Amino acid sequence: MKKLLYISVNTKPEGMSASKTVGREFVDRFVQNYPEYQLIEHDICNEYIPELDHRFLNDNGDIVSGNDYNLLSDNDKKIVDRINDLCNEFVSADVYVIAYPMWSSLFPPRLKMYIDCIVQNGKTIKISEDESSGLLSDKERSVLCIQSSGGVYPKIISWKINHGINYLHDIFRHLGIKKFEKLLVEGVDVQDIGKEKAVEKAFDEIDELIDKMQVRDFVKQ
């Protein structure tokens, strides 16, 4: 069974959050169209996401394992287990949906903490002395980032404002995921638009995006 991993990043409950509202609508429609997908969800602002610490890293900067792991305290072992569980779950997925609000031209810090957990040498990326390369090109995968924002940013300046979208595009491409889509829920705080209209406009784009996000049964040889 294929897996759809849905990551929402907002302290607000779903009914108050534009990004979560659009994210829910997307994943519900996606699973209706493709029932062979198992939906896995994380509301990471309301779950425990570890912050990386030197105690959990070996001399190469990798998550500890083997004897280094055995030397950890019981509590630190649980933290490392959680980090590895999040990473392994990410590797096992096929389609990723990340819904978040724009904060200071980026995204809430909890999302960066999550990304730090899933970017691991030997699992999602291969790091050598000369280069680093992604390991997630082993099968077709796709990512959709749903970003809500109070304002509306014309394309001519969007690249200067949407640093969060740009960062996520770059980091996932570096991991080997080449199919990347975005859904901007803009104008939530603009008087002539507002949350309701911004969400409705985003809803109108969902069906087309679902077709783009579906992945084939292709495994890299």
Curated annotation (Swiss-Prot):
GO MF annotation terms: electron transfer activity; FMN binding; oxidoreductase activity, acting on NAD(P)H as acceptor; oxidoreductase activity, acting on NAD(P)H, quinone or similar compound as acceptor
Domain of life: Bacteria
Gene3D superfamilies: 3.40.50.360
InterPro entries: Flavodoxin_fold, Flavoprotein-like_sf, FMN-dep_NADH:Q_OxRdtase_AzoR1, NADH:quinone_OxRdtase_FMN_depd
Binding residue positions for FMN: 17-19, 148-151
EC number: 1.6.5.-, 1.7.1.17
EC top class, as a word: oxidoreductase
Record text on cofactor binding: Binds 1 FMN per subunit.
Function recorded in the entry: Quinone reductase that provides resistance to thiol-specific stress caused by electrophilic quinones. Also exhibits azoreductase activity. Catalyzes the reductive cleavage of the azo bond in aromatic azo compounds to the corresponding amines.
Any Pfam family matching the protein: Flavodoxin_2
Cofactor dependence: FMN
Family recorded in the similarity comment: Belongs to the azoreductase type 1 family.
Catalytic activity: 2 a quinone + NADH + H(+) = 2 a 1,4-benzosemiquinone + NAD(+); N,N-dimethyl-1,4-phenylenediamine + anthranilate + 2 NAD(+) = 2-(4-dimethylaminophenyl)diazenylbenzoate + 2 NADH + 2 H(+)
Keyword list, A-Z: Flavoprotein, FMN, NAD, Oxidoreductase
Record-given protein name: FMN-dependent NADH:quinone oxidoreductase 1
Cited PANTHER family: FMN-DEPENDENT NADH-AZOREDUCTASE 1, FMN-DEPENDENT NADH:QUINONE OXIDOREDUCTASE
Subunit structure: Homodimer.
